[in-house]
Every structure is written in structure tokens, then in C-alpha cells.
Amino acid sequence: MQRALPGARQHLGAILSSASVVVKALCAAVLFLYLLSFAVDTGCLAVTPGYLFPPNFWIWTLATHGLMEQHVWDVAISLATVVVAGRLLEPLWGALELLIFFSVVNVSVGLLGAFAYLLTYMASFNLVYLFTVRIHGALGFLGGVLVALKQTMGDCVVLRVPQVRVSVVPMLLLGLLLLLRLATLLQSPALASYGFGLISSWVYLRFYQRHSRGRGDMADHFAFATFFPEILQPVVGLLANLVHGLLVKVKICQKTVKRYDVGAPSSITISLPGTDPQDAERRRQLALKALNERLKRVEDQSVWPSMDDDEEEAGAKVDSPMPSDKAPTLPGKGAVPESSLITFEAAPPTL
């Protein structure tokens, strides 16, 4: 263990040296708050449901709870999550969008978690759910990063034996955390943070994230039902469509709007908000193929003579006199050969 620490420290330093300011700031905040926990009580930085809502309004905890850790292994998970997000997501989104994503996920996890425990208190009247539960840590952001990786590189293989793709990792980890919770090896706020991180990040990436093609990602491979096994996807898809229709009616979500753009004079580009570039390229190739087939059929038809040309040729043959093989003969005289000279008879003298 002591031999591995210097190598890991050196590797982490090399990664952070090439990271952006956002990644460095988040990692520094995690380390600072962890070291601060040895000197003072940092419980006021975690989301406590009874203190977040009125009359206390500990609003700042929505910004700090995702950075607060109390164990060294939790610090390692937080740093690894931030570094992975910086290496894989920041080149696609940019540093500002990564910071926005981090803020949206953590604020949503804090609000949804506090509201869930408030409902639990209203059902059980147990004050533990209001003033003892503390929501903190990077598991919520970890769930958001895994959802974003499913969106961007879902077909990548994480394990070869057994074969595990990135697209199934979010639900696999959720199942693992659920088993740990049932075995009392994990506290309920950690499981709640991860679950709400999955939901909030998917909603943001699906409907609200801004990019060059519009807003959100309505691709089929990123539908909510794709997070579940194939046998459950039809049922989950039906329920998700019902919920989405309800949210559209109350104007929380917007309808899927198709946008048609003429990309070039030689082709037509049909783009949907959040469409995968590979899908757009495939549609473009199909459109070009269909256009080439139509042009080929038109060229083949132009080779055959038209009916109008046939009728004109037939009419010309009818109007023109048929040449005779023999010249007309006068009775009692021999045949006179044809002559191309034209003779004129002398006109009578005028008076």
C-alpha cells in the first residue's frame, strides 16, 4: 500500500497538471473540505432536510454538499469522478458547460433528496428523517457522469469478460448500491443521492442542455426506457411517454420539434434537436441514394424515343408522295425520260 501511494500521487498530479481550471478547483475544494472536517464540524455544509426548508433556509448547502466527504475512500471516489468528467466530457462540452452540469446535478440532488425525506417524515412522523439525515458526497455527480457517458459513448466496452458496455453501467451500479443498502453496508442518503443524480442528469441532458443543434438530446438510444433491460423497455417506455405528455401539458417540458435545414445545394440535411451525427450522416446517404436512383430512371427513360416523335415521322411519310418507278407514257409514244430542266412556252404577242 505504501509503495502504491507515491505512484498514484504522481499519476494524479500528472492528470491534474493538464486539467482545466474547473477540474482543478473542484478537486481542490474536495480536498480542502475533507481536511477541514478534522478541525471543525462540517455538518452545516451537508443538506439536512429539516434545515433546508423554512424557517431555517440553509440554501448554501445545495452548493457545498456535493463537495463534502468524511472518509478517505469517499474522497478518492470524488476525485476520480471529477477527473473522469474532465477527461471525457469537458473536451466535448467545454469547461463552462461541465461546471453548469455539476451545479445542476448537485442542486437537483439536494432538493429532491430533501423533499423525499420530508415526505418520509410526513408518512412516519419520525424526526430522524428531518434532522439526522445528511445528504452529501459525490455519488449524485457520479450518477450524472455515468448518464452523460451513456449518452456520448454508450457502445464502448468496459469489461470484456463478461462483456459490459458503458450504457448498462448506471443501472448496474444502482443495483449494487441497492444490495449494499439491503445489507446495511450503505446509508440511505448515499443511495438516494445516486438515484436522484441519475434522474436529474438525464432530464437535463434530454431536454434542457444547450448545444449547436438546439437543446436536449431526443435520440432513441438515450430514451429513458433504454436504462432498463429489454424485457421491461416497452412498459417503461409507455409510462415515460405518459409522464412526458403530462409534463408537456403543464409546460414543464416542451414538445419535440423537428427542424429541417438545407445544408448544401447538392443535398438536404434533416436535423432533429440533439440528433446523433452518425444518424444524420446515415439519413443523408439514404437521401442521396434515393436521388441517384431517380436520376438514373429519368436517364433511362430519355433513351427511348417518345410517342410524339413516332407520330411526326409517320405523318411525314404520309404527306410526302411515293416515288414512281416509271415515268408516265403518252399513248402512241415511247417513254420520255424525266428532265430536271423547266421549259416555258412562248407567250402570244400583245397588241
Curated annotation (Swiss-Prot):
Keywords: Golgi apparatus, Membrane, Phosphoprotein, Transmembrane, Transmembrane helix. The chain crosses the membrane at residues 20-40, 98-118, 127-147, 166-186. Residues 206-229 are annotated as: Mediates localization to the Golgi. Residues 300-351 are annotated as: Disordered. It is a multi-pass membrane protein. Its main location: Golgi. GO terms for cellular component: Golgi apparatus; Golgi cisterna membrane. It comes from the Eukaryota. GO terms for biological process: retrograde vesicle-mediated transport, Golgi to endoplasmic reticulum. Residues 1-205 are annotated as: Mediates homooligomerization. The modification Phosphothreonine is found at residue 329. Residues 41-97, 148-165 are lumenal. Belongs to the TMEM115 family. This is Transmembrane protein 115. It comes from Bos taurus.
